[in-house]
Curated annotation (Swiss-Prot):
The gene is rplK. One or more lysine residues are methylated. This is Large ribosomal subunit protein uL11. CDD domains: Ribosomal_L11. NCBIfam families: L11_bact. One of its GO terms (cellular component) is cytosolic large ribosomal subunit. GO terms for biological process: translation. Belongs to the universal ribosomal protein uL11 family. One of its GO terms (molecular function) is structural constituent of ribosome.
Amino acid sequence: MAKKVIGYIKLQIPAGKANPSPPVGPALGQRGLNIMEFCKAFNAATQSMEPGLPIPVVITAFADKSFTFVMKTPPATILIKKAAKIDKGSPRPHTDKVGKITRAQAEEIAKTKAPDLTAADLDAAVRTIAGSARSMGIEVEGV
């Protein structure tokens, strides 16, 4: 018989930097999960990723105090800002443009995000990324 699920916890944790301090500790502690076990497993799983890159993670907590977790791809906005070499988007995105990315950069981001996007093909995924970039005040060349 399958284990009884008692809850799901959604967090964004920097790659390789999970520790028992908030938000990780309180979120897992409320469900009675072993915080250090999660931190070690998460840090080991994100070892090959760029340190500090925020990684969304969904933790499934079971009644026997065990857990599993699924890591998602980094948020598109983070990847877009990194490609455009800017710190934040425009406060008035359709009026003030703060940066540019090329179609090749948008394709690279779309390939990275592909597992989490609902797009049918690469071109649709690129258009999704381009839309996110435009809403941040970043111009996308060639889309």
